[in-house]
Amino acid sequence: MRQAEIVRETKETKVRLAVNLDGTGRASIATGIGFFDHMLDLLARHARFDLEVEAKGDLHVDFHHTTEDVGIVLGQAIRRALGDMRGITRYADLHLPMDETLTRVALDISGRPFLVFRTEFKVGKIGEFDTELVREFFQAFASNAGVTLHVETLYGDNAHHIAESCFKGLARALRAAVAIDPAAAGEIPSTKGALGG
């Protein structure tokens, strides 16, 4: 089974996260941040990962540390669950519509962390959630998953829809990229014979 569980504890947060890449989309999410829980729930559902997240953080300060640290741990867990990445599809790209919004996501599970994030929000908050934290989550995730990730919102007005299209786009790209390619016969999808840098 391609699964992993990680616990990360700092002076700012404690995060326990478990992921099963070959799941059914079941999610149990509790970060103390309602909007972020919603984004993680739909990420699990659309990636069809089973995902458990328990996070306790310094929410009295703001939501930054918790959001970033969950991104760190999710990235680490997916990287660990993939193992040597043998047989995976590796690449995925798609356009994700959410009402008036359209976001393009391209992903390479390469072992080389890089993020291009071209998404702008017209407001600073969605409820109590700072919209700048969407990028912080994606940066933390890409850096720790070891993936090259491009996220670009081509157009959109509603901040909730923009954020949701980014998370759903990541979910669908992950679902496609981690899928086992039956034609690859268990090969590592790289001419170098290894992924990881």
Curated annotation (Swiss-Prot):
Compartment annotation: Cytoplasm
Disulfide bond positions: none
Signal peptide segment: none
Tagged with keyword Repeat: no
GO annotation terms (biological process): L-histidine biosynthetic process
Record EC number: 4.2.1.19
First-level EC class: lyase
Annotated metabolic or biological route of this protein: Amino-acid biosynthesis; L-histidine biosynthesis; L-histidine from 5-phospho-alpha-D-ribose 1-diphosphate: step 6/9
Catalytic activity: D-erythro-1-(imidazol-4-yl)glycerol 3-phosphate = 3-(imidazol-4-yl)-2-oxopropyl phosphate + H2O
Superkingdom of source: Bacteria
A GO CC term attached to the entry: cytoplasm
Entry keyword set: Amino-acid biosynthesis, Cytoplasm, Histidine biosynthesis, Lyase
MF annotations from Gene Ontology: imidazoleglycerol-phosphate dehydratase activity
Family named by the database record: Belongs to the imidazoleglycerol-phosphate dehydratase family.
PANTHER family in alphabetical order: IMIDAZOLEGLYCEROL-PHOSPHATE DEHYDRATASE, IMIDAZOLEGLYCEROL-PHOSPHATE DEHYDRATASE HIS7
UniProt-recorded name of the protein: Imidazoleglycerol-phosphate dehydratase
Species this protein is from: Azorhizobium caulinodans (strain ATCC 43989 / DSM 5975 / JCM 20966 / LMG 6465 / NBRC 14845 / NCIMB 13405 / ORS 571)
Gene that this polypeptide is encoded by: hisB
